[in-house]
């Protein structure tokens, strides 16, 4: 059954990926994939079974990236099953519905930008308090650093007027190499930064 094979496959995910990815994979399988196909035999699994998982998630309003991740999980699982000679099933037609939309990003507006540089307080439980991280927020806006890169920044990363980005800290407090290969980079500080 798929649910039994999933346990084996997930053990390989744990060995080969970071904690953040493991949590995301486990969550998608627990909430979306296993309830739909967990009781099926791997030999009776069809591409439509997998597409139904994606379509149901789409109708529930999941963002395009989440749907892509669902597809990637199920493709990786099928590839692992093929490697173990459990099936020859290859879901090549599995796709994200055309109407799927990316999650919108909230862009900092000019009036909010002015406020960021004029005010050093934040609302905390309905009260205005001094924000200890105000300079970090300003630095992030001026440099374009991702939040995890900002947390991972060390004084040793600044040499002269150049900042070398080589690490990030994820939501679990783990040090990583960054979001992708482009995350390792260097830039010259502006006068304002």
Question: What positions do the PLM features span?
Answer:
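Catalytic-site neighborhood detector that most strongly recognizes the C-terminal catalytic loop/helix
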Residues: 4, 107, 168-171
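Generic beta-structure capping elements
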Residues: 45, 55, 97-99, 119, ...
